[in-house]
Amino acid sequence: MRKKTDLHSHGTSEKQIEGFVQVRGAREHNLKDVHLDIPRNALVVFTGISGSGKSSLAFGTLYAEAQRRYLESVSPYARRLFHQMSVPEVDSIEGLPPAIALQQQRGAPTTRSSVGSITTLSNSLRMLYSRAGNYPKGQDILYAESFSPNTPEGACPTCHGLGRVYEVTEQSMVPDDSKTIRERAIAAWPPAWHGQNLRDILTTLGYDIDIPWRDLPKKDRKWILFTEEQPVVPVYAGFTLDEVRHALKRKETPSYQGTFTSARKYVLDTFANTESPAMKKRVSQYMVGKECTLCQGKRLRPESLAVTFAGYDITELSRLPLKHLATLLHPYAQENTPDWDKLAAKNPEKAIVTQRIAEDLSNRLSVLLSLGLGYLTLERSTPTLSPGELQRLRLATQVHSNLFGVVYVLDEPSAGLHPADTQALLAALDRLKQAGNSLFVVEHALGVIRHADWIVDVGPEAGEHGGRILYSGPPQGLSEVAESHTRRYLFPDKEADIFAKQPSRSPQGWLQVAGVTRNNLDNLTAAFPLGVLTSVSGVSGSGKSSLVSQVLVELVSKALGQELVAEAEQGESIEHDTPATLGGRITAGMESIKRLVTVDQKPIGRTPRSNLATYTGLFDHVRKLFASTRAAKARHYDAGRFSFNVAKGRCGNCEGEGFVMVELLFLPSVYAPCPVCKGTRFNAKTLEI
């Protein structure tokens, strides 16, 4: 590691940087016994290529140790309620203040979480309506909880605060009415034996399951799909209608007694009661949502929606863009509305409450606007936000909190942010620093790196070839570190222009779309060149993701006849989904497209056992290779024997994890290598191959 550059030579005085966080012997992940001094009360940016060890140092070491020390001051009982990070591999850290982490991660798992809830602006807005709203004559005052769709007091009794009601229809359950019941015309019924059982029961009940669905009498179709009756009848498995009639006449012994369940009842009961995500996902495709007729999609009780402020009910106000909401509230915060004097004279208490809540909302909204988030609405659901938007929302909350003496650890706050908005982000970071806080930022954006007071460059390469501190000091000093990849971009050599223009390719065709309508896109027409790399740009919130990640994917998928399966976030289910209308059409270019592959930012692994080799299928070949050896064949070992997810080959002590958890009461759990397999994850017999 290069020694710290002389502070005076780069315009940063010792007076500006007061004290250091001293890290000694950091060995978390790929860090190689790192010794480092990091200044406090400064903007410190951790740089280096992906996988070099930046996050291991900033989050895995500094933040994890700060959290551990903080939790030591919390009562043992309360400590158990926190999600505690593992104890970092480090000899010592001195001079470390309390830390708050703002990481690149998804928000709450359901769409009931919104911009308003994670910024707590919705709480203030509900208080504003409760204490300062205009009530209809004779209506009693409502508490703030009555303006939340997530509480029994406020949720619409019909849709339970969802804004939509879900039902099943004949068209959704029977997509092809030319099929017979025996040919599985009722797609909503279960597959395999259970579905065959229901078809056999219909035969016993006297229904002909061998004529097209459309030819059945309407009364029969309605009973089969929607009845709540559950008759128990004898079942003659595999018999035709005539054979069943003869068997009943002769009083033959049936195969068994079966209970009939209509298609609607099966779908709704399965969705409500099953614990299988796969079963829930299957039946959800037969459910159709529509806007709740009682609340008109506003999710609240009628008495809550009857209360207004500035002519809006609370849902209408929550649907305004934040910049419009700030404009609406500003006159109330300044006591400058046309009827303010009248309000103050008639109801001074209400005037005071209105002014104070409006002022608080205005101040908090101004921070969001300065971070370029004015296009969002309070009602915007969390899962639809990008990781960068989520992190900037959390950053705005911290800017408004006015904490002092805290370390903020941020993970690429510029991610997804247009360069035009970067200056606003830097201004917010400066406000936190000027308030007496320290900022440790993991970042790749050159604009943020250049703005840093101090740079910690980690590398030189990724993985085992990284984990060393190449440089720690003011930004200008990095220009002297030859092995730094960051230096090449921060201080590019004129002789070797890394930004030299590459030869461009000519389009081999054009994919043209028209009438695109989604979110803020209104009847848009666009053309995408084929056979080339295309970048879709625009400021944050301009509609890039709506166009490319949503509409374009859906239109191409539909044109190819592919089933577009959007993986729900953990905890998501159909009752939280509001289907978006497929707005737009492809006018030309589909003849050149044979396949659609969507690559997004969602985690690829579903379980902790998932790794790069298992996800890509590489490990399948490795297992087959071991199974093909002479020793494995002699022992009759198949490929499954060499999987740490299968009991016959994995270590029985750690169940293929490679480590065991040692649970310590009131302390973070400690993970240690398995004493039986020594971390290899397999049993001794398997390892002999």
From Swiss-Prot:
Q: Which UniProt keywords apply?
A: ATP-binding, Cytoplasm, DNA damage, DNA excision, DNA repair, DNA-binding, Excision nuclease, Metal-binding, Nucleotide-binding, Repeat, SOS response, Zinc, Zinc-finger
Q: Which species is this record about?
A: Paucimonas lemoignei (Pseudomonas lemoignei)
Q: Does the keyword DNA damage apply?
A: yes
UniProt superkingdom: Bacteria
Gene Ontology biological process terms, A to Z: DNA repair; SOS response
Q: List positions binding ATP.
A: 48-55, 538-545
Subunit details: Forms a heterotetramer with UvrB during the search for lesions.
Q: Where in the cell is it found?
A: Cytoplasm
State the protein's purpose.
Answer: The UvrABC repair system catalyzes the recognition and processing of DNA lesions. UvrA is an ATPase and a DNA-binding protein. A damage recognition complex composed of 2 UvrA and 2 UvrB subunits scans DNA for abnormalities. When the presence of a lesion has been verified by UvrB, the UvrA molecules dissociate.
Return the Pfam families for the record: UvrA_DNA-bind
Which GO cellular component terms are attached? cytoplasm
- Coiled-coil residues: none
Identify the InterPro entries for this entry: ABC_transporter-like_CS, P-loop_NTPase, UvrA_DNA-bd
Q: Name one GO molecular function term.
A: zinc ion binding
Record-stated family:
Belongs to the ABC transporter superfamily. UvrA family.
Please report the name of this protein according to its UniProt entry: UvrABC system protein A
Q: Where are the zinc fingers (C4-type)?
A: 651-677
Among its keywords, does the record have Cytoplasm? yes
Q: Which residues form the ABC transporter domain?
A: 211-491
Designated gene of the protein: uvrA
